[in-house]
């Protein structure tokens, strides 16, 4: 049986760990709330961009744009996968789930090329058979619009240059505080029919009756809106992934705190047993010594 000193040392170590997990839980809770507020505050702007794109599609049908599905290219030769992971661990299966989803997607694509966001994703795929084109890292802070612009500009420039023929985005979607699942989204090339189906949710009946004039042309206005649209999609995915990460870390820290408290309770019982055994032994020795002196 362990002595009292060993039990006390273990209890002290677990108490220190418990303080850390509770502090990380509080920090993740605060970051989660802030991320949700930011997502709610920026959503109206990018929703407005989507509405404007619907207006153009409704008016022009299928404007000529290099962002739509290209013809005469002989199919898809290279596919880019933008994967959103984190820069820190201690978030349960958050990063592992994303990396597995990306691996599964890459296995179905022809010549996949990786654009990674987060250092953990880079460490996971650096020795994989897939080529890493670029790695972005934001040091575990709340993503900003400029971060999304940096990624969107890179993706769009490489797409227009012909480095790849299509772009997939993989991130963690937060269905609820306890349900986080990897999600895939095809962001390039655009498909007019798919966009119409998605964008008709925006008060389509009222807007269909409105007439807009686009200067200098619908094609030029549309091409100017697409980078903003893609930036909005990427930014929303970054913030949602950030919020999901904080939720996963909060859940992991709650579980760790619960386990630490259970271990402390068990150690306290063990400590009491060891202490009681020591007291019993001392009393027995005193009684035995007293009896020997009486004889």
Question: Where in the sequence are the language-model features?
Answer:
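C-terminal beta-strand-loop-alpha-helix "lid" module of Rossmann-like NAD(P)-dependent dehydrogenases
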Residues: 1-295
């Amino acid at each position: 049986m362990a002595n009292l000193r060993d039990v006390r040392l273990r209890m002290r170590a677990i108490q220190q760990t418990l303080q850390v997990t509770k502090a990380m839980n509080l920090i993740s809770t605060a970051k989660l709330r802030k991320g949700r507020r930011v997502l709610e505050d920026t959503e109206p702007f990018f929703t407005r961009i989507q509405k404007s794109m619907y207006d153009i599609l409704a008016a022009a049908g299928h404007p000529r744009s290099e962002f739509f599905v290209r013809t005469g290219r002989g199919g898809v030769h290279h596919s880019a996968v933008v994967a959103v992971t984190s820069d820190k661990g201690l978030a349960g299966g958050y990063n592992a789930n994303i990396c597995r989803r990306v691996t599964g997607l890459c296995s179905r694509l022809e010549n996949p090329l990786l654009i990674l966001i987060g250092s953990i994703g880079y460490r996971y795929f650096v020795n994989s058979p897939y080529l890493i084109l670029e790695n972005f890292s934001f040091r575990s802070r709340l993503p900003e619009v400029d971060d999304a612009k940096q990624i969107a500009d890179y993706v769009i420039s490489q797409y227009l240059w012909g480095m790849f023929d299509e772009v997939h985005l993989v991130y963690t979607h937060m269905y609820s505080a306890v349900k986080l699942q990897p999600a895939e989204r095809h962001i390039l090339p655009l498909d007019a029919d798919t966009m119409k189906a998605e964008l008709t949710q925006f008060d389509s009946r009222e807007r269909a009756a409105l007439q807009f004039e686009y200067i200098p042309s619908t094609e030029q206005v549309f091409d100017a809106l697409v980078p903003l649209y893609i930036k909005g999609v990427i930014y929303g995915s970054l913030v949602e992934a950030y919020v999901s990460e904080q939720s996963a870390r909060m859940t992991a820290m709650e579980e760790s705190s619960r386990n630490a408290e259970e271990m402390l309770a068990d150690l306290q019982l063990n400590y009491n047993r060891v202490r009681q055994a020591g007291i019993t032994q001392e009393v027995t020795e005193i009684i035995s010594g007293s009896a020997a002196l009486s004889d």
